[in-house]
Structures are given as structure tokens and as C-alpha cells.
Amino acid sequence: MALEFPVIDPIIFSVGPLSVRWYGLMYLIGFAFAMWFANRQAAKPNSGWTKDQVGDFLFYGMLGVILGGRIGYVLFYQFSYFIENPLYLFRIDQGGMSFHGGTLGVITAVVIFAWTRKKSILQVGDFVAPLVPVGLLAGRIGNFINGELWGRVSDVPWAMVFPTGGPLARHPSQLYEAFFEGLVLFLILQWFIKKPRPAGSVAGVFLLGYGTFRFCIEYFRQPDAQLGLFADFISMGQILSLPMIVGGLGLLIWAYKQATQKTAVKG
């Protein structure tokens, strides 16, 4: 027997024409955590960051998430529709955000911020990477509350019948993503940053971890209706995750190789 989906009104409350939604609140929670955690990290001795720099980057980062997420969704998942309806890019009221697009937006923000502040791109990336997973966790919970991005049909005991997913029970894949891409990845990064690490390695762990978790969970997530599976076996989410896996692994190997070479020179 399938579990009953806990139907929650996506709108928390409304004041006149203004509605406050759970999904928007989740974005706010993710941003608030990032601000708190970043300031906490910046306050540590020799962090190389000031409170003002944290605030400046978070502004750039927020723009990167929003603009990159929206542009990425339109280009990756709705490209054909966008070609016929270019103004769809600005129809944010119709929803649609891509984490992979948001990642590209944040990477762009990292590069711009590092260049304008005369900081190392790798060090900025390492500082930013641990801020992301809690935002992912909150965002996926928002997806679950909205009853969207559900999983494939399943008979597991915890499968649910989603309001927009037809009569069959499905994997609550949003919760899988919240757990692995959010909580587990956050804990991995917290363990990893307890010790000094080579420049670029923290960002590498994030890219590798997220890409791997997302690639695997895509097997439980319903493919996008307008795209389906490419070659009948791989989803768009998996295609976009592969560069993250390869890039993260490559960055990790390069970072530790550089650290080893520096140690050998000093020795």
C-alpha cells in the first residue's frame, strides 16, 4: 500500500495580491544559512575573508543562482519551446529552475568576484562550496511540498501517489535528493574542511559528490516529459551531471598533485 502524500498548500499566506510560498521560503532559508555559515567561516583566524566580502559575494552568488538557474532550465529543458517563445525566459511565474544552470551561475560569480577582489578562484570556490548543500536540501523539500519533480513508478513501501503524478505510486525522489545532495553532502564537506586541504579540493569534493548523487538518483526520478531519455537510457540530469563528476575528480587529482609537488620542493 502506498503512503498518502501529505498535501500542503504551497502558499503559506497571502496579503492582497502578494502570496508567500513555501518554495520561496526554502530559497530564503538556504540563503540565510549560507550567510550565517559564511560569516562563521570568515571569522576564523587567517580565513582571508571579511564580513563585507562575504556580503558582497553572497549578492553575486544569489544573482548567479537565480539567473543561471532560470537560463539553464530554459536552455536545458525547454529549448524548443524557448525558440518559438523567447519571452518564456522571463515567465518566472510559470516556474522552472535548473540546479546545473545555477551552478554555472555561481561559478561565474566566483570567477568575477575572485577577479575583482584579487583572490584565487580556487580559494573562493573552496569557501563557497560548503554553503551550497543546505540550500539544495531546502529547495528539494520545497519541490516535495509543491508535489513536483516526483519519481518513477514504484512498489516500495514508502512510494507515494502524487497529486499531479497520476494514480500510480512513485518514488519520493525529491526526498532522496534532499537527503543525499543536501544532508549527506553537507556532512561530507564538514568532515573534509576540518583539516587544511589543497586549494581547489573542497570545490572538487562538492562537484564530484553532487554529480555522483544526482546521477544515481536520476534512476529513481521521472524523466522530464518533454525530453524523456536520450538513447533510451540516460536523462538530461545525468548528462549534465557527468561534467561535474569528471571535473570534480579532475580538480581533486590536480589539487593533491600540486600540493605533493610543493611539498617535494620544500623538502
Curated annotation (Swiss-Prot):
Protein EC: 2.5.1.145
Gene Ontology cellular component list: plasma membrane
GO biological process, one term: lipoprotein biosynthetic process
Chief location of this protein within or outside the cell: membrane
Cellular location(s): Cell inner membrane
Membrane topology: Multi-pass membrane protein
Protein name: Phosphatidylglycerol--prolipoprotein diacylglyceryl transferase
Protein's organism: Pseudoalteromonas translucida (strain TAC 125)
Classification lineage: Bacteria, Pseudomonadati, Pseudomonadota, Gammaproteobacteria, Alteromonadales
